[in-house]
Structure formats: C-alpha cells, structure tokens
C-alpha cells in the first residue's frame, strides 16, 4: 500500500469562532452556567480585575499609494487570481456595491474606535459547562503568522475582493445600521464575535438566573478556554484514528514562525490570496472620505473603506492579553454564510478585527482623541487567533476519509448576530439598576429557549451599547441589543430564521409556515429574488427561505433526530405579516411552485473535490450569491466526501448555464502544483538509498510548509502536491525548494491552471505565438489539456526553479482581465459607428477587445459579470489598467443620465423593509421611474440592512436620497418615572400636545412607561421623517415644558458648545419654516454697563433658557448690525450714539430706504439693514437748511419720512422717541408722555426703548424674550404695517390733504395733520437740519415740556371726537399711531378692512421695495 500523507491547517479562514484563555472572577472561583442556556451580556463600567498591560505597540508601515485613477477601483471586473497576484497596482478596490456600507456616523465610529483602543484586557473565567461558543469570525483564508499584521488584509481576498459583480460578498455580516460590529469584505465573510461577557446574566431553560460579575470593559464572552479547545481536538483525533485506521497528529500553529521569511513591501510572507493590496489605492477609492465632507446626498451613511486599519480601527482591541487565544470558525472555516454578520454593515466594524478573531460588537466609548491611531499602532502586537495543523498519514482512502471527518466535525463554531431594539426584548430597567440587572421579557425568554431546544444553537443577548448614538440636546437613537446565535453551521442557520420570526411576532405580526421542496426555493424566488420581492410587495409580508446549504456540512441535527430534522427544516418557508397578507402570500407561493415545478431541468458538472471543499469553506457567500442571482439551486456533495459532481437545478437553460460558468470561474482561483523528486543519477543495478524519501523525514517539512504558506501539502511517491490559492502555492513551492533535503534531488515543478474554454484562443495567440514566446524565453513547457465542457487545464512545467516561476508569471500576464458594464442598447449603434469605425479606433487606442450584446444575445447569455451588464471588455492582464480608460471613452458618447450604471447600497433598518416594500411600493416605483434605477431589498432571512440600488451614477444618489425620505427616523429621550409624569402623560392636554406636534412638526410622540415596577424611566419615542430632524429639539423642549408645568421631573439638558450658525440671520421666519430661536443675543459691543448686561443675558440664556437657541450663535447678522446705541437718524441726520459720529461711519450698516430692520423687533434696540450708501452728514446749527444745501439730493415727493422730523429730542429734532426714517413702513411711534397711558404695540415690540434706559433685569428680559409669530411676520411683512397705516388713515387719525392725499407734505414743510400726532412739532421743526443735531441733544426745557403736554391733550380730544362719529367700528379699540406712509393705491383704503392674506402681503412688499429702488 502506498503511503499517503497530507498536512493542512484549520481553520483556513481565521476568526469563525474563538476560544479564550481561562480567567477567573474576583473571588478566584470558576463560574458555570447551563449548557442549554442563553445569556444576557451587559457591559459594566468598573475596575479591571486581573488586567494586564498589552504588549508594546509598533506602528504599522504605510503601504505605497496607488498610481491608478480613483474611478478604476469601482469597475466590475473579473480577474483571475494569478493576474491579480502579478499586477498588484491594477486592483485597488471593490465595486461600489461592496464598498458602500452604513455607518452610524463618523463621530460615532471615532468614539467607538477610541474606546476600543483604550480598553485594557481582562481575564474572565469561562463557563465550564457551556457549549463551545465562538468569539469572532473572518472570511478570507490566510495563515495567522504575519510578520506585520497591519498588512494582513493586503493579500487576504484577492479574488474575492475583486470578484465579479454577481457576488454579494461583504453583504453578510453580523451587524446592522445601529450596531457596532464587524464587516468583512471577503466572500467568506464570517460573523462577528460572540460570547458571554464576564459581567453577564445567564439563564437556563428552567429560568434560573446566575450572574458572573467579573468586570470587563470590552464585553468579550468566554464560553470555553483554549484548554477545552485542545481537549476537543484531542478527542476528535482519537476518534478518527480509531474509526479510519490512519495516523493523526495535530499541533497548535506557533505564532512566531513568520520571522523566518521576511515579508515583501506589499504583502506578508505567506499570502493566502494574491499579493495586491487594497490599501494601495485607498486614497483614491471612489467614495467619500468618512473624515471629511461627503458628496453624497445621504451623508449620514459614511462609506467605510474596507479592510483598512484606519477605517475599521473602532473594532480593534490592542489591549488584549497575550495569553488569550482566539480561535477561528469552521464549518466553512469561514462561516460567513452562517451569520448575518456579513449582511449588515456596521458603523465601526472591522475586516481586520475579524481576521484577528476579535469581537467588534462591544460598547466602544472613549474620550481619548488619539485612540484611533493607538489602535492602529497596536494592531501589530495583537495576539493571533489559534490555528491547528493536522498531519494525516496512512492509506489514501483512509487519509481522505479522516480529512473529511475533520472538516465536518471540527469543534469550531459559527456565530450570527442580529441587532434588535432594546425595548423589544428587555423590560424597562429602573434608573438606578446597572445594565447587567436588566431582565428579559418572559415571553421572549420562553421563545428563545424553545429555539435553543429545537436547533441546538446557543443564543446570547448582548448589550452592545449602554446608550444610543448621541443626537445632541439630550436626544439619542434607539438603544440596540444584539441577539447572538452560535453553534454549528446548520444550527445557526435554522436558529437565525426562527429568531427573526420571533422578533416579527413580538412586533405584532402573524406568522405561518408552508412546506415546499427545498430545490424549488431559489427557482421560485427568480433572478435576484425578484418574484419573492414582488409577492412581498403585493401582500405586505416578509418571506424567510431556509438556507440552501443545509445538509452539506454534515448535520448534527440528523444524528440527534434520526435524520428527519434536516429534511423537515429544509422545506419550511416562514411568512410573517398581517393575517390576510400572510394567507395571500402563502397561496401565491404555492401557485408559483406548482407552475415552476413542471419545467424544472438539471445539469451535472464535474469539479475537483479539493476545489469543492475550498469553495464550501472559503467561498460560501460567492456560491450563495450565484444561486440567488440566477434563480437556481446547486446541490453540493457532502463536505470532504471526495465527490466531484455538482447538480444544478433551474427552470431555464440560460440560468443553469450561467450558474455553471460562474462556479467554474470561481474554481479557476484554486491552483494545484506538484514537485517531482528525481535522483541525481539512476543505476538500475545499484539503486541509491536516497532514491526515495522516508515519510518520517517528510512529516516535519510538510507541517512547516503548510503552516508557513496556508496551503495543503501532500506527499506521495516522492512527489509533493500543493493545493491552494495562487500566492499560497507559489510560497509553498519556494519553501520546499529551499529545504536542504530537497536540494540533493533533481526535480521537476509543474503548475496547473484552470481556465474557461472561451479563453483558450485568447491565451494562445495567433499560431500559439504567446505560448511559444513564454516557452522560449523561460525554458518551460506549456501544455493545454481538456478538462470538461466549460474549463480546460494549462500545465506549466520545468526543471529550473527560477525559470518555472518566471514562466508562470509571464503566462499570468497573458491571462485575460475582464470588465463588464451596462450601456443602454439605444447607444450601441452610435458607439460602434458606421462599419465599426468608432469602436475600432477606441479598441486600437487602448488595446482592449470590446463586445456589445444586443437584446437577443443578452437574453441568451443572461448577462456578463452582473445580471444587467451587456458590454464586456477583455484584455491581457499586463494591459488591465486600460480597461477603465476604455470604459470612459465608450461612455463619452452616452448621455449623463444613462451612463455609468452602478450598484449602490443604502443602509435601512431591517424592520422598515416590509413597510417600504408593501405600503410605500408606489413611491418606490415612482423613484425608479424618475431616476431610471431599480431598488432591490435583501433576502429577509439574511437580516441584512443593505438595500441595493442599481442605476446610472448621476441619478443613483438622488434615488438613494429619495428613498431615505420615506424611511422613518426614530429618536428618544428619557425622564425619571413618577406619579406626576404618569398623570401628565395620561391627561387630555398631553394628547392635544402630541397631536399638535404631529400636525405642526410632523413628529409622532409615543411615551413608554413600565407600570409593573416602581421607579425606572419613561421613554419618549419621537418618530419622524429624516427631513424634519431639525425639529427634534423643538419637540423635546415642548414635551419637557409640558412636564415641568405639571411638576414632573426631567433630566437636566446637557450643556452644549456653541457652534457657528446662520440661523439667527433669519429671525423673521416662523420656526415652522426654519427652526430658530425666539431671541438671538446681541453681537454688538456695549459700552461699560451695556457690555455687562449683554454678558449676563448670554449667560442666563445658556443656563436657563429651555428652548433651543438655534439663533443664539454668532452669524452673518453681525456684519450688518448697527452701532451700539441703535439710534439712527434719517438721511441727512447725524448719529447720536452717545459717542463720536465715526461709529456710524465705520459701521457696514447704513439706513435703508427699503424697510425697517427685522432685528429690532424682538430686542431692546433697533437697527437698519441693507441701505444704499450715503455720505455722512455734518451737523449744522442752521435751522432752515435743506438737504440740498448739505450736499445731499432732496428726497422725492411722497417718499416715506420725507417730511418727518426726528423724535430723538425736543425742539426741531426729536421728542424723546426714536422714529425710524427708513423707507417703507413706519413702525409705531408715541410721545414719551404717552408711555404711561396704556399698553401699546410699540411697547411690546420694544421699538422705542434702548438698553441704556433699562435696568439690568429688564435688559436680560429684553434679550431673552421670544417673539411671537405675528411679530416675526411683521418684521418681514411690510404689507401688514401698510394695512395698519391704512386703518389709521381711514379712522381719520392721519389727515389727508388734497395736495398730499397720503399725508405727506412738500419737502421742507411739516406734513398736514402731523402736528396732532407728534407733540412739539411745528412748521419750522419739520425742516431737515432744524434744531440741534443728535450728538448735541439737550434735555427739554420746562417751556417745551408744557407745550408738549398741551399738544398731547389736544390730540386726545381730537381722537375722542373722531371715535364718536358713526360707522367708526370699535370705539373702545386701542389706537396705535403710525407715521404716514405712501400707498400703491390712488384712493384711500376703505374702513374696517381686514388684513390681506400672506400672498398679498408678499406682493405688497415686493412692489414697495421696487418703488423705493426706482425713486432712489
């Protein structure tokens, strides 16, 4: 019997599960919990028990930047892994649909990263009796021994990161929009870390509660130690040796062997994938910078660069103790499919974090600003997850059977994470209780126990966040809890669907199941699940299909339940929704299945068994994506069974053929190499003792090479076989040829590459020119072999090590690099040109072959790399950089609205998908038609939040923003529970307030109070559209004011730093239009006491004022404000500011001929804005000087204020009252003696009083007094004051003469009828310049005061006579006196005229402003 030995390392994909070192609680005892229990994790702040300092961090070197343009990274391309390995600079990023993932926000991600980097390691004791629980998963295959872990992700996922666009890689990860979990960019993206926090409450099925009170900040759960892992592997090895009669040895992979082989600048020494770096072109990736301003219309979704320490540093935990061993997952050794983890993009998830097996779903909060850099620097010092190397030897069949058993029954577990609202699963906890003391709702506890019993999975509830994301002003997002499902692959898949159904039931939906053959599920769903989405849209339901891989990894349920459980679960489809919708959806599914089942066809295809095992373990998400994209089902053999046939089921030949082609293309990434050892000289009569190697000598070499490279290394009959990815195979061959034992032999190296048949002519060239050139240049032999109907094999062999590797590299340069994209068929003829001249010129220019597919060809192919792609470009890999240039040239002839069709993903919480697809389907279809795009929702069973939008690049962001407008936004704030609060909430006034908020601000308020226990907190949930988020503080303040007025306690509002804003530049708008504060502070510099008054008012406003002061920040208004005293004369008047006239001259603001300043309306001062520039007027003692004599043109006849005098003082100028002289509307003015007579509008508006005449308390009140909506409107609405003035004219209080029908006298004379309104005004006083200037103002003499009193009495008598006239209206109505004003009508306004509507007011304002400009 030939001796066959193989050595391989598991898990290939690091991070699928974890086993952490043993730790003890503060008492030194080991805590335990029932193995059938699910637990509640709640991070608790406190001292670190048993903490130790992390190893010294070393900074990670920066990779070189890529020279490629940014747009090159967004192309959809299909490059063989060998091509990518040879051209690292040509492959810098992922397609857009894989890059764009939701983050909660850049601020939150930075805060999470800071906490993650600053946290210290804690040793916690695992639960001894609990089942093995995974901690973290990662998706790509690569060895754990990295010289520089910061470069770990550079070569991780060569082929998967730049996979074709069919894949949904990176869309299955264990987090969602509100979570902080890990995101993997690989197709094998595994779920994020799980486990039981050291401070956790664990309950079993019997509802017994046990608490572990170990203090640990990161909240990493330890359910089994590394010692238990080793014991489990030891038991597995013993069972295999007993059952399969072969020798099995295993050893933990050492963590320091990588130092033997130094890394290259761009890759670590033993790359698991091609050696291109996703970090190279990070600065040119075509998505917004998360740290800067985003060009996307939905900026709250900051795209995260994938696989880079900077972008995912929030999930790094550099402080992990060196002794803590983190394992990796396995049933796919990647387990990405097992988890929702790759489905939901995290706010702070990390690809690298999953690679090192860390959980990012931790409470990450830290104030340290340098935490992100520290976390990146400390990445290189982080311990690697444990890997185990298995060495099997014996007969071929026995060894292969043992290998399959190890792949299926390894002790590594899978993890899936679902983010749910905290209120759905937890009771409202009292305010004083710590998070770990929160209790799970009894019905939720019972249902989760039932799921555990039925599936064998372990369910953990974990508080990933103590608080929601801070929205400011005491508001936060909804608090989230993680439901972590861990166990074997099939257990996790089944339990996840059941948990999702339970969550829908908690939300009040009805659920039902229906039985349909599992092979029909994807066929019923259609391409990209279009049929299922249509059913969900019409019925308003959620349809959960089971996993397509049940039974592939070896069923643990089958062994426990006589093999019946898997068959039962494979066929179950869960439907949730409203009762009648569920019934309709069930009937429609049965109807479609009956129709589809009549036309099912299948086809078999052959693939090498090791390639099948690799795809099932490392490319599970790629396979899932292929099936969903094509609407087919692929029956894979049992993992490790050495079966080489797959069966593809579908309802259309095109879909089946495209599925097989895609799988075959995926298999081309896996290489096989062989190293044949030949003796130096062979003598048949005297055989050399060294002709054959002793298997005992080979075993250490196999282990070393397998550990170093990550490939599977086999030795049989003096021949080494290496199986793995291209970079792994290259590394392994180089390592073997360096061994001293091998150098004593002659050898022949052979590389076997698999390629699609359609590329056979492309790679050979004309008359095999390309192949002959490589063979002649490198001295190698290249041979083509037929393999199957879809692929062929290329053998590259030679006896010289350097020649063979060089020949392989040159051949890789000739391998095809493809890129496909979508161009509307209407443009095909225009691009191709007459006789193909246009496209031939482009092809010749860039050396790229292009093919356009019309509708018939497209239907026959089913699309290229993506379902919608109808143009494909192909060129040798050495010319791959020109693919993007060719695409740009082709797209120049396409209209912007139709060019660059791409796929973007928008993160929308999973719970809104059913409503959006059902109730709001009409809006979605409208968005699709307006933007020429299509919206696809993810499969419900994946619990993904990523909604895909496919459309032109110029329109897709508009479509995303329009879609987000229909997504509700939820925020909440809390208040201490009390009897008064309960009474206030249940009162009719609160219902009226809620109705008013909903009507005025479009915000729905839902209070939640726990009535079953004393104390606790009341939660006020505010639900609104994203466009109304500016009104959140207003609604919160209204609710809190309502509670305060009813003696209910509330939490103090957090003090916030002031930020620059332009909000107070628009105080005249009501806050229903623009959310502004009632009164903005003054930006003026008061003199002495005035400055102190302003400072006191500002401090009082910050500390006491409850309404949000959006207008209280420095703004552009400061540029236009008036001098400190705010007393302005009209044109030709000197400024009386209590100082020199230079104050007014230096101010950028001058009096306006348009309208009075709106800023004076709500303060104790007034100011004018936006006036035409005028020259300063020098005061003169001449009493009869006219404006023309002073160097100023005289005002036009009829100009408002032309014949008015200043009321600033007695005599010719002023009567103690400031009369605005700007054009437009004259605000009310009253003599000072009338201020004690009664309430006036001008008093309320503080138009006549400055701050200098007020006490300190009055000044503060004046600054803080909010203005009413009516006064705000008066600030802007000139027509409103015009109507009041018209009323004055109609009442007769302002006389209208025949020569001046509008109450305006000629220039230089007093206006008729004005003497009764302004005491102290005489004909001589009506002239400009008459009397002392403002800055020479003298107090009134006793004679002047007596004269003013007499005139005032005469005025009162005249008013009484007018009020006694019949038809006057309301005789006792208070009269407000306005200065005369021009009217746009030639007739006097009628009496008792109501104010016109707002549109009329706007028109009046516009006309008045135009007239003023015309006259100027």
From Swiss-Prot:
Residue ranges of the region described as Disordered: 25-76, 108-174, 196-225, 255-320, 341-385, 1215-1240, 1289-1416
Biased composition (Polar residues): 357-369, 1219-1239, 1391-1402
GO cellular component term of the entry, any: cytoplasm
Alphabetized GO MF terms: mRNA binding
Compositional bias of kind Low complexity: 196-213, 273-285, 341-350, 1343-1374
Disruption phenotype: Affects cell growth, pheromone response, filamentation, cell morphology, as well as pathogenicity. Leads to increased levels of mRNAs containing the AUACCC sequence.
Ranges of residues in domain KH: 412-504, 508-594, 747-816, 817-892, 900-968
Domain of life, source organism: Eukaryota
PROSITE patterns recorded: KH_TYPE_1
UniProtKB keywords: Repeat, RNA-binding, Virulence
Function: RNA-binding protein that recognizes the sequence AUACCC via its tandem KH domains 3 and 4, probably in order to promote mRNA instability. Plays an essential role in filamentous growth and virulence.
UniProt-recorded name of the protein: K homology domain-containing protein 4
Phylogenetic placement of the source organism: Eukaryota, Fungi, Dikarya, Basidiomycota, Ustilaginomycotina
Gene: KHD4
């Amino acid at each position: 019997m030939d001796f066959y030995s193989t050595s391989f390392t598991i898990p290939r994909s690091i991070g699928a599960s974890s086993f952490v070192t043993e730790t003890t609680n503060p008492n030194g005892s080991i805590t335990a919990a029932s193995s059938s229990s699910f637990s509640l994790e709640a991070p608790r702040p406190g001292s670190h028990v048993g903490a130790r300092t992390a190893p010294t961090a070393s900074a990670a070197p920066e990779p070189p930047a890529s020279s490629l343009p940014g747009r090159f990274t967004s192309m959809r391309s299909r490059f063989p892994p060998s091509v990518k390995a040879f051209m690292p600079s040509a492959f810098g990023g992922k397609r857009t649909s894989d890059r764009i993932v939701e983050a909660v926000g850049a601020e939150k991600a930075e805060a999470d990263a800071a906490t993650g980097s600053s946290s210290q390691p804690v040793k916690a004791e695992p639960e001894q009796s609990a089942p093995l629980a995974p901690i973290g998963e990662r998706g790509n295959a690569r060895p754990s021994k990295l010289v520089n872990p910061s470069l770990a992700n550079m070569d991780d996922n060569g082929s998967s990161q730049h996979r074709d666009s069919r894949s949904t890689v990176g869309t299955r990860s264990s987090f969602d929009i509100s979570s902080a979990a890990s995101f993997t960019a690989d197709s094998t993206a595994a779920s994020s870390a799980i486990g039981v926090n050291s401070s956790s409450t664990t309950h079993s099925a019997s509802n017994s509660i046990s608490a572990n009170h170990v203090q640990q900040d990161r909240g990493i759960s330890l359910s089994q130690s590394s010692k238990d892992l080793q014991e489990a592997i030891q038991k597995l090895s013993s069972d295999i040796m007993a059952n399969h009669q072969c020798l099995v040895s295993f050893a933990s992979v050492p963590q320091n062997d990588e130092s033997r082989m130094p890394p290259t600048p761009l890759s670590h020494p033993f790359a698991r994938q091609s050696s291109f770096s996703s970090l190279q072109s990070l600065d040119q990736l075509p998505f917004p910078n998360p740290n800067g301003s985003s060009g996307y219309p939905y900026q709250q979704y900051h795209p995260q660069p994938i696989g880079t320490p900077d972008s995912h540093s929030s999930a790094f935990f550099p402080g992990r103790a060196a002794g803590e061993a983190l394992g990796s997952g396995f049933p796919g050794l990647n387990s990405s499919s097992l988890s929702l983890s790759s489905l939901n993009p995290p706010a702070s998830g990390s690809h690298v974090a999953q690679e090192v097996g860390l959980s990012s779903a931790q409470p990450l909060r830290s104030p340290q600003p340098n935490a992100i850099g520290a976390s990146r620097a400390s990445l290189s010092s982080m311990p690697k997850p444990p890997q185990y190397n298995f060495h099997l030897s014996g007969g071929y069949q026995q060894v292969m059977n043992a290998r399959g058993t190890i792949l299926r029954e390894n002790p590594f577990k899978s993890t899936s994470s679902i983010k749910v609202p905290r209120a759905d699963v937890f009771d409202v906890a009292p305010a004083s209780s710590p998070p770990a003391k929160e209790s799970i709702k009894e019905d939720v506890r019972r249902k989760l126990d039932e799921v555990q019993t039925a599936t064998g999975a372990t369910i953990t509830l974990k508080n990933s966040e103590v608080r929601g994301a801070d929205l400011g002003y005491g508001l936060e997002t909804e608090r989230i809890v993680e439901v972590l499902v861990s166990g074997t692959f099939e257990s996790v898949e089944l339990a996840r669907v059941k948990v999702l159904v339970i969550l829908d039931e908690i939300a009040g939906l009805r659920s039902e199941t229906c039985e349909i053959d599992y092979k029909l599920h994807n066929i019923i769903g259609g391409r990209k699940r279009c049929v299922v989405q249509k059913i969900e849209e019409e019925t308003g339901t959620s349809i959960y299909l089971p996993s397509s891989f049940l039974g592939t990894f070896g069923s643990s349920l089958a062994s426990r339940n006589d093999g019946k459980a898997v068959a039962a679960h494979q066929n179950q489809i869960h439907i949730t929704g409203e009762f009648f919708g569920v019934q309709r959806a069930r009937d429609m599914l049965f109807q479609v299945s009956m129709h589809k089942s009549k036309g099912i066809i299948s086809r078999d295809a052959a693939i090498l068994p090791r390639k099948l095992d690799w795809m099932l373990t490392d490319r599970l998400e790629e396979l899932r994506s292929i099936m969903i994209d094509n609407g087919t089902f692929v029956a894979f053999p049992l993992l490790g069974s050495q079966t080489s046939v797959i069966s593809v089921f579908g309802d259309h030949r095109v879909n089946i053929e495209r599925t097989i082609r895609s799988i075959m293309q995926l298999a081309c990434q896996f290489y096989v190499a062989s190293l044949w050892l030949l003796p130096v000289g062979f003598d048949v009569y005297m055989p050399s003792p060294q002709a054959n190697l002793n298997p005992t000598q080979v075993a250490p070499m196999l282990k070393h090479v397998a550990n170093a490279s990550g490939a599977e290394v086999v030795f049989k009959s003096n021949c080494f076989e290496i199986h793995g990815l291209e970079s792994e195979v290259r590394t392994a061959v180089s390592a073997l040829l360096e061994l001293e034992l091998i150098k004593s032999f002659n050898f022949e190296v052979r590389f076997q590459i698999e390629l699609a048949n359609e590329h056979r002519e492309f790679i050979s060239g004309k008359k095999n020119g390309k192949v002959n050139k490589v063979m002649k240049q490198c001295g190698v032999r290249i041979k083509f072999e037929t393999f199957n109907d879809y692929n062929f094999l290329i053998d590259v062999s030679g006896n010289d090590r350097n020649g063979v590797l060089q020949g392989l590299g040159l051949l890789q340069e000739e391998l095809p690099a493809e890129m496909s994209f979508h161009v509307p068929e209407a443009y095909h003829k225009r691009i191709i040109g007459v006789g193909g001249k246009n496209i031939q010129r482009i092809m010749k220019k860039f050396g790229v072959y292009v093919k356009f597919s019309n509708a018939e060809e497209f239907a026959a192919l089913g699309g290229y790399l993506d379902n919608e792609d109808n143009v494909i470009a192909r060129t040798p890999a050495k010319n791959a950089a020109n693919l993007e240039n060719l695409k740009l040239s082709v797209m120049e002839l396409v209209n912007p609205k139709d060019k660059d069709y791409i796929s973007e993903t928008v993160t929308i919480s999973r719970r809104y998908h059913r409503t959006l697809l059902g109730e709001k389907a009409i809006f979605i279809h409208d968005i699709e038609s307006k933007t020429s795009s299509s919206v696809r929702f993810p499969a419900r069973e994946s619990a993904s939040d990523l909604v895909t939008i496919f459309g032109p690049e110029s329109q897709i962001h508009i479509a995303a923003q329009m879609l987000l407008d229909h997504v509700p936004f939820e925020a909440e704030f809390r208040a201490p529970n009390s009897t008064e609060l309960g009474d206030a909430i249940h009162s009719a006034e609160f219902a009226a307030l809620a109705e008013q908020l909903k009507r005025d601000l479009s915000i729905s308020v839902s209070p939640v109070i726990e009535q079953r226990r004393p104390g606790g907190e009341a939660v006020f949930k505010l639900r609104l559209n994203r466009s109304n988020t500016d009104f959140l503080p207003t609604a919160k303040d209204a609710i809190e004011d309502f509670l305060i007025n009813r003696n209910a306690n509330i939490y103090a509002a957090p003090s916030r730093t002031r930020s620059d804003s332009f909000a107070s530049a628009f105080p005249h708008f009501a806050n229903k239009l623009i959310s502004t504060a009632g009164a903005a502070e003054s930006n003026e510099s008061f003199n002495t006491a005035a400055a102190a008054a302003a400072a006191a008012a500002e401090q009082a406003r910050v500390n006491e004022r409850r309404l949000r002061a959006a207008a209280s920040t420095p703004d552009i208004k400061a540029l236009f404000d008036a001098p400190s005293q705010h007393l302005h004369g009209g044109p030709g008047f000197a400024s009386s500011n209590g100082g020199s006239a230079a104050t007014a001259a230096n101010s950028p603001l001058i009096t306006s001929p348009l309208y009075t300043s709106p800023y004076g309306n709500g303060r104790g001062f007034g100011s004018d804005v936006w006036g035409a520039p005028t020259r300063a007027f020098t005061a003169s003692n001449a009493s009869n000087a006219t404006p023309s004599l002073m160097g100023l043109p005289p005002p036009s006849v009829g100009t408002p204020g032309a014949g008015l005098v200043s009321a600033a003082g007695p005599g010719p100028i002023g009567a103690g009252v400031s009369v605005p002289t700007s054009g437009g509307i004259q605000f009310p003015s009253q003599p000072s003696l009338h201020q004690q007579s009664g309430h006036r509008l001008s008093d309320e508006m503080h138009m006549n009083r400055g701050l200098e005449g007020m006490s300190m308390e009055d000044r503060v009140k004046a600054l803080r007094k909010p203005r009413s909506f009516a006064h705000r409107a008066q600030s802007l609405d000139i027509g409103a004051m015009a109507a009041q003035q018209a009323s004055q004219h109609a009442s007769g209080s302002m006389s209208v003469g025949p020569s001046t029908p509008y109450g305006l006298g000629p220039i230089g004379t007093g206006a008729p009828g004005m003497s009764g309104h302004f005491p102290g005004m005489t004909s001589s006083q009506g002239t400009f310049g008459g009397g002392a200037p403002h800055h020479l103002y003298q107090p009134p003499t006793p004679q002047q005061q007596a004269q003013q009193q007499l005139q005032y009495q005469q005025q009162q008598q005249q008013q009484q006579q007018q009020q006694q006239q019949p038809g006057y209206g309301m005789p006792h109505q208070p009269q407000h006196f306005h200065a005369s004003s021009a009217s746009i009508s030639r007739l006097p306004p009628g009496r008792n005229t109501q104010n016109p509507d707002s549109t009329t007011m706007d028109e009046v304002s516009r006309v008045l402003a135009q007239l003023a400009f015309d006259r100027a």
